[in-house]
């Protein structure tokens, strides 16, 4: 397998999908944007635009597991979304345990100066995507081209 240089991270949700970008050279992930979704279905044209712009070597999708490590109700939907990304765009897709990333993202938002309004109006999904992608980068240095 070729070494990975640039990755997108996705925090999948039924109403919003957080997106982050990570680079092997820095080993760091950062938040990028939040996409709206209708019952878990994104605007695929916007997903295509992100892929065209960033040209990721792979995408990491958060896998929402229960605290005991078993699949949650959303796990199957996230895995189906991962397969659709691979099928539509031909990019390698990995899944990564995303337990507590939304909780951590809310804490990070508070540390940055607090939450302004509701999380619906000011979502933390892109922060959660960056956290899960950072976790994946930290756990898989052997796959990175550094």
From Swiss-Prot:
Q: Has UniProt tagged this entry with the keyword Plastid?
A: no
Membrane spanning residue stretches: none
User: Could you name the Gene Ontology cellular component terms for this entry?
Assistant: cytosol
Which superkingdom?
Bacteria
Primary enzyme class = hydrolase
User: What Enzyme Commission number(s) does the record list for this chain?
Assistant: 3.1.-.-
- What processes in GO biological process is this protein linked to? rRNA 5'-end processing
- Cite the GO molecular-function annotations of the record: nuclease activity
Subcellular location field: Cytoplasm
Tell me which Gene3D superfamilies the record gives.
YqgF/RNase H-like domain
Q: Does the keyword Coiled coil apply?
A: no
* Keyword tags: Cytoplasm, Hydrolase, Nuclease, Ribosome biogenesis
Q: What is this protein's function? A: Could be a nuclease involved in processing of the 5'-end of pre-16S rRNA.
User: According to its UniProt record, which protein family does this protein belong to?
Assistant: Belongs to the YqgF nuclease family.
What protein name does the entry list?
Putative pre-16S rRNA nuclease
Give the organism the record lists. Pseudomonas syringae pv. syringae (strain B728a)
């Amino acid at each position: 397998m070729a070494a990975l240089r640039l990755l997108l991270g996705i925090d999948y949700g039924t109403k919003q999908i957080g997106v982050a970008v990570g680079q092997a050279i820095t080993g760091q992930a950062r938040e990028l944007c939040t996409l709206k979704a209708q019952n878990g279905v994104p605007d695929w044209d916007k997903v295509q635009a992100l892929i065209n712009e960033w040209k990721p070597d792979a995408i990491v999708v958060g896998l929402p597991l229960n605290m005991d490590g078993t699949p949650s109700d959303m796990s199957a939907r996230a895995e189906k979304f991962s397969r659709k990304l691979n099928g539509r765009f031909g990019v390698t897709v990995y899944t990564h345990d995303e337990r507590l990333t939304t909780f951590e993202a809310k804490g990070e938002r508070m540390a940055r100066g607090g939450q302004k309004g509701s999380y619906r109006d000011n979502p933390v999904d892109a922060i959660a995507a960056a956290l899960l992608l950072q976790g994946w980068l930290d756990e898989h240095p052997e796959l990175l081209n550094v």
